[in-house]
């Protein structure tokens, strides 16, 4: 299955309940982005088009059992002409494993601003340096050959004091060029708990061979 096919959740006779697959992610249990992507996919099924996700905040409550189906219950907190708010709770059996609150709105033009991005090696150049930057492990999102990652950072295990962008990389989902805007948001939610989250610790030079990180919560805003 492609990533977007795997993130798809199936409706049930209950309009607020959706069923999603799960699978092992190595020693990490169920990867946090798996919850994020499927929860957003469930909520989007309850929101009329052309609304898109504006933001979400998710809380990881339990590791979950890989290979066991997930049930996502969506609750409507607000439905307005130009926006909507949903909560999404994921269960395995009677165990609550994940919770999300998400906001949605109609696409519209508005004021825009953007910080100047850092200089990053183009994907092809990063690919040429792949062997020199080979990591001694794979990230969960790489395990099922749905996501390609190329590192553009000079180093991975050492922080760069004063550098606000210590981790630079390219990520590509196989078949991503065929996705619509909602599907791209689901994919971005899936990727959000991946390597990019490590920017919070790499800046401090925390050695990954002696420290273990775990996601407690995750917030994201979708900008146009």
Language-model features, listed with the residues they occupy:
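Terminal targeting signals and extreme-terminal segments of soluble enzymes
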Residues: 1-224
